[in-house]
Amino acid sequence: IPGNRAIAYSAKSKYSRIKITGIAENAQSKVGDEIVVAEALLNQVIAEAGISDHFIVETFIGSELAGTICEHPFKGQGYEFDIPLLAADFVEMDTGSGFVHIAPGHGSDDWELGIANGIVVPDTVGGDGLYYKDVPIFAGIHVFKADEVVINNLRDSGALLANGKITHSYPHSWRSKAP
């Protein structure tokens, strides 16, 4: 999340904006919240997020998201920049929400999408795997030990819908285990 500079979506897929009208006891969302989710993943997302009831406000094709700008979830904590939504062919509809967090300094797809759209590529992590001292919230934390800090800050900012364990590839040296 510290390196996030955009969010990718599928221009060809359908998305639904839903209004949450019921939640499970331990849900992160609140009744009245509205979220946008890929239509193909809606049932999976509401189950994982503990959403017990909702209604669909609208359904639309992803290309209608072009030009949408979001706030970084850590705005007010050193992340004072806009997060554009960008169409990308690599967004898949088999897991997640139908959106992909884009950190152009941390992956080849992210890099290519960022560069193609004039997104600044931040330098956030040193060769030792530690976030640089000028990275707000995460300074000095190793990337493989930042999960709890990310989750807690997302929760505190009201931007956490659900959390769980996933396997995610990250560019690093298999020999040294350093990013």
Language-model-detected regions and their locations in the chain:
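NTP-handling and nucleic-acid-processing catalytic cores
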Residues: 1-128
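A broadly tuned preference for mixed-charge, low-complexity surface segments
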Residues: 44-51, 156-167, 175
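Generic, well-ordered alpha-helical scaffold segments in large soluble proteins
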Residues: 73, 113, 117-120, 149-157, ...
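Intrinsically disordered or highly flexible coil/loop and linker segments, enriched in small
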Residues: 79, 159-160, 179
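The substrate-binding groove and active-site-proximal loops of carbohydrate-active enzymes
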Residues: 99-101, 133-143
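Short linear loop/turn motifs
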Residues: 127-131, 168-171
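Phosphate/diphosphate-binding loops
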Residues: 142-170
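Cys/His-rich short segments
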Residues: 172-179
